Amino acid sequence: LVERNKKMHIKKYPELKSEIDKAYKMVLDKKVLPSMRSMQFGGKPIEISPNRIYNCAYVPVDHIDSFSETMFLLLGGTGVGYSVQKHHVSKLPVIQKPYPKRKRRFLIGDSIEGWADSVKVLMKSYMNGGGSRIEFDYSDVRPKGARLVTSGGKAPGPQPLKECIVKITGILSEKEDGEQLTTLEVHDIVCHIADAVLAGGIRRAALISLFSADDQEMIGCKSGNWWETNPQRGRSNNSACLMRHKITKDFFLDLWKRVELSGSGEPGIYLNNDKDWGTNPCCEIALRPYQFCNLCEVNVSNIESQEDLNERVKAAAFIGTLQAGYTHFHYLRDIWQETTEKEALIGVSMTGIGSGRVLGYDMEEA
């Protein structure tokens, strides 16, 4: 895995071969770690879809393409933070149902792009107006258990996608022409999308949903017996987005009481300075809309000197810089590449802090 990962970077940055070799000697010595997505999908999968090198991303659901992009990212192994805040969802087109007597067949491609396109086609059929009712053809989707050649593993078969399409259609068909999707409906659609993402028969999608602090439907999203009536909501952590400069003590305590009464420990509380910024599912970092996080890690459990620490951090930052250059996203809107290049994040974390070995060293120097 390490050699495959290294060769991928050398192929992209041949002029940096000696520096890459040096940095990856530290990877082999277990002193630093690249992004786990880059280890998992190093080589052809990332060369085909560079988004797969990134652990997580953030997208506001303010555009019809946000739904298909979420499917695309989740299927590629990237966790997704998304916003259903009122000012984002209000930008979505209103519902304009397809003509029931006019039908159009859509053959779903046997690929990540094909699955994402099925969501895109479905959403457009209910939001672009005057279109045909889509009849999805799953015949090209490989059967359950078939080998996935590029990324490895086994195919889930068409059933998870069928269920996803049926459930999303159920939400859309209940609306009247001219109505807008509610924040909770948008949230549920994204959760149904996540339900379709499986690997080896196990759910493999990470989500966090940020919503407006006064959104009562979203606050109660996981109240009552939601796991029976709306089990898809278990795919996402749900967090109220509170503006630090606006929040009052009384409002916070009222919301905290709702958390206690929910019995689920949710909603979470996400403190923010800008309502348009979001985060990744683990809340490790603030992200602009349409931005990816980029992580490397330093093993500090066996640091031997300040110089050793400095060299490890330097190597991790270098690998992170290499990873940040994978931005030619072929399926996503152009704004993803623009944002990720403009705000090229280089995250370097530490593991092994509990050993205490690193506590005596100068972090600022490192």
Language-model-detected regions and their locations in the chain:
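Extended catalytic cores of very large enzyme megasubunits
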Residues: 1-366
